[in-house]
Amino acid sequence: EFITEALDGKNILVDACIGSGKTTSIQQLCNAFPPDKRILYLTYNRLLKLDAQAKIKSSNTTVTNYHGFAMGVLRKANITCGIPELVYTFNRMKPPIDMYDVLILDEYQDIEQEFADMLWYIKSTNPQMQIIAVGDMMQKIYDKTTLNVPAFMDEFLGEHITLSFTKCFRLSAQLAEKLGRIWQKEIIGVNDACVVEEMTPEAVVEFLAEQQPKDVLCLGQRTGL
């Protein structure tokens, strides 16, 4: 449904639960758009950008993060500045940018005010541009902005439809249902192989010593175990 509605030209806001394959869906969509569509796919950080660049095969899609986009545009306009000032300088100078038919935002929940200002400028130069935003407010990682993201997205998208990705490929049905109660949203777990164990700090250290770093994701308190 997501790809069908997007190819129909609709502005879309996707509320995607954890492990629902939202980024994979965006990548499939980019490969499904006609080759004459000029697509700007903005990710929140560099790691997401590199992953998307490796998986999107269509040459009509520009994949970058916000700082990378600002850097490219400023360089093209012969404007130089330090990396920390990229977005600020972009918003102040408002350099000319390329034309795009489609704007795709990944992890929209982490958009900050300066990124919102950048997006408004991009939209002002591409008023007919289709906008697709995918994210999950319950997975908001960064909290260094006063921006009301839901209100911003509603205004920025204008007339749009809202879709929900509720199927979680990471969690079992029981764990997904429990997380859904905590977050007050529907999460349908389909990974019956998911196992959660409670371990002592010593057991955790011993377990991690036997694993490959690329296979491990650690979530914990800022102060450690």
Stretches found by the model and what they are:
Residues 73-79:
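P-loop/Walker-type NTP enzyme "switch/lid" segment
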Residues 6, 82-101, 122-126:
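Short basic/glycine-enriched coil/helix segment immediately N-terminal to the Walker B
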Residues 5-57, 61, 67-72, 102-225:
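Conserved helicase motor core of SF1/SF2 NTP-dependent helicases
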Residues 60, 80-83:
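Cytochrome P450 catalytic domain signature, combining two hallmark sequence patches
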